[in-house]
Curated annotation (Swiss-Prot):
Transmembrane segments: none annotated. Pfam families: PYRIN. The gene is Ifi208. PROSITE patterns: DAPIN. The lineage of its organism: Eukaryota, Metazoa, Chordata, Craniata, Vertebrata. This is Interferon-activable protein 208. PANTHER family: INTEFERON-ACTIVABLE PROTEIN 208-RELATED, INTERFERON-INDUCIBLE PROTEIN AIM2 FAMILY MEMBER. It comes from Mus musculus (Mouse).
Length: 588
């Protein structure tokens, strides 16, 4: 074992083993290694961890005592975890040694040394012979090599797949160009056979003849062997590249066409006598179909690229105005919140036909057409004359309303804004199947008086409201509605019913209060009120007269007095007056 490996093992023993032990475990280790290290009493007391490591390296030169340390630590319970660490470190060192031994170069033998030193006579003879055979002009040489046919058979699919890991020869197709970028590793047997052939042959072209008979995988190694010879008559690299014809191959392939000898990493162009090498070694036959996808860099002509792919033309019709608003024309979308203004729509917007089933916007506010919106909250300014006739034929499908919305959504071409939270409903866009709010009419005043004894206060409020309306006619409800757009049918009916109830004469209300019996559906009530009801009703009537005073009309005062007289004329009230309360009523 080399000294470097022993040094690695010693580092593990000292740094990963002895340094992690406490004093007690270290003294126990010295005691257990007493016979192996031949420690005396003084040595056990004086030697520290470094001296023990040096002594273990001396006594166990194989691994610096690492295996012995692991064996001893297994017997100590406190160092059981340290044993696994030491074994892992030991395996790492062993793996390093294996890798280094495999990657170490082969030593040069005497036969190899003799092969590198080729006799100069053979080189001279071969160079002279090659000078006679090579034409002097580059044009004639190019035509000659192009006319020659390859002497080697083409590789089949199986041989090509098997030889992908081997060095690439110029005859090989570019399908295995990835392996040609790697440094070729020549097998030892092929080198020895070729070198032995070059030594034993007497003819100057024996080596080239032998190389022509071997498979294409061994030809590359033979060419690299012949490359070391100092041949004077060889083909320069410029002649190799001049054989490529740019007329028959596209520009993308010309950029990737290189001779395979030049592509080899760390190797020069193979210099071989031209008489022994056929044209297939010099002119690599490259076809665009066989190039790798990573190697091909096709230059697409400008005419083949469509114009729409070069510039992305964004039409205004595809621009969105908000987060949840559908795609619509920019000419019809405004971000104003209260007063949307609709401008003329171009004819290209007429093709926007969107059904309601495709529009599922998670908004609670209905989106209706700006041309038909009439809401008490917004005042849209619409110019119907600017819309063309065919632009108003947008397809609307109210039956396909989305369940996530509370109201139908119509075409996006005329949406004023998607940010308005106020519901905008018109009589044109609301279908018959749309669920209208069922407004139950107000309870009759008789039932209120019969069930609630304090209904007189509500009556007083109604009187005050009518008096204020008579005094201030400009603040009424009728004038207030004149400034607003007309309501829908349901709202108009409700408003008319409410006005009719408010416009009832006060005499009718007083008659219902004093003379008509209460009518309820829950239970049957006696036609005459009880004593307690009459008592409270009398007090409320007296308070009504006192609070209103001169504000009430003469007719109202007269009816109130008639009601009090009618209540005082009953027998029960007379009995009640005998109890001491008749004085106040008579005075009134």
């Amino acid at each position: 074992m080399t000294g470097e490996m022993v040094n690695y093992y010693k580092q593990i023993v000292l740094l990963s083993g002895l340094e992690y032990m406490n004093d007690y475990n270290f003294r126990a280790l010295k005691s257990l290694l007493n016979h192996d290290l031949k420690l005396t009493k003084n040595m056990q007391d004086d030697y520290d961890r470094i001296k023990i490591a040096d002594l273990m390296e001396e006594k166990f030169p194989e691994d610096a005592g690492l295996s012995k340390l692991i064996e001893v630590c297994e017997d100590i319970p406190e160092l059981a975890a340290r044993v696994d660490i030491l074994r892992k470190e030991m395996e790492k060192v062993k793996n390093k040694t294996k890798i280094k031994s495999e990657s170490s170069p082969l030593p040069l033998t005497s036969s190899l040394m003799e092969a590198w030193e080729v006799e100069p006579a053979m080189v001279t003879a071969s160079s002279e012979e090659s000078k006679d055979t090579i034409p002097e002009s580059p044009d004639t040489m190019t035509t000659q090599f192009l006319e020659e046919k390859p002497k080697f058979p083409l590789l089949s699919a199986t041989s090509t797949s098997q030889a992908e890991g081997e060095p690439l020869t110029p005859q090989r197709f570019p399908t295995t160009a990835s392996s040609s970028l790697q440094t070729p590793l020549e097998p030892t047997e092929i080198l020895s056979t070729i070198l032995a052939t070059s030594q034993g042959s007497s003819a100057p072209y024996s080596t080239c003849d032998k190389s022509s008979r071997v498979p294409p995988v061994t030809v590359s190694s033979s060419l690299q062997t012949i490359q070391t010879c100092q041949a004077t008559s060889t083909l320069p690299c410029s002649h190799h590249t001049s054989l490529e014809s740019p007329k028959t191959e596209p520009s993308s392939v010309q950029a990737t066409q290189m001779t395979q000898a030049i592509k080899a990493s760390g190797h020069n162009c193979p210099q071989v006598p031209a008489s022994a090498v056929s044209s297939s070694f010099i002119k690599p036959q490259v076809t665009p179909a066989m190039l790798l996808s990573g190697v091909q860099t096709p230059l697409m002509p400008q005419a083949t690229v469509p114009s729409r792919a070069q510039t992305f033309q964004l039409t205004p019709a595809k621009m969105t105005s908000g987060c949840n608003s559908p795609q619509m024309s920019a000419a019809t979308v405004y971000s104003s919140y209260s007063n949307p203004q609709v401008t003329p729509v171009h004819s290209s917007v007429q093709i926007l036909q969107m059904n309601l089933a495709a529009m599922t916007i998670g908004c609670n506010s209905p989106h209706v057409s700006a041309a038909t919106v009439s809401s008490p909250y917004n005042n849209p300014w619409v110019t119907p004359a600017t819309f063309p006739r065919n632009a108003q034929t947008l397809q609307l499908y109210p039956a396909a309303m989305a369940h996530a919305c509370n109201s139908p959504q119509v075409s996006a071409a005329t949406i004023s804004s998607s940010y308005n939270n106020t519901p905008q409903v018109s009589s044109v866009t609301v279908p018959r199947s749309f669920p209208a709010m069922s407004l139950s009419p107000a309870k009759p005043l008789k039932a209120k008086i019969g069930s609630h004894l304090g209904a007189t206060d509500q009556l007083v409020k109604d009187h005050q409201f009518e008096d204020n309306e008579m005094q201030n006619p400009q603040s009424g409800l009728g004038t207030g509605l004149s400034d607003q757009p007309r309501l829908s049918r349901t709202q108009s009916r409700t408003e008319k019913r409410r006005r009719k109830q408010e416009e009832q004469p006060l005499a009718t209300k007083m008659k219902r209060l004093s003379l008509s019996p209460p009518q309820t559906t829950a239970r049957r009530v006696n036609p005459m009120p009880t004593w307690g009801q009459l008592k409270k009703l009398t007090r409320e009537a007296e308070g009504l007269v006192q609070r209103t005073g001169n504000k009430l009309s003469s007719e109202t005062m007269f009816l109130a007095m008639l009601a009090l007289i009618a209540m005082q004329s009953s027998s029960e009230i007379c009995n009640y007056d005998k109890g001491g309360h008749s004085g106040t009523s008579s005075e009134k």
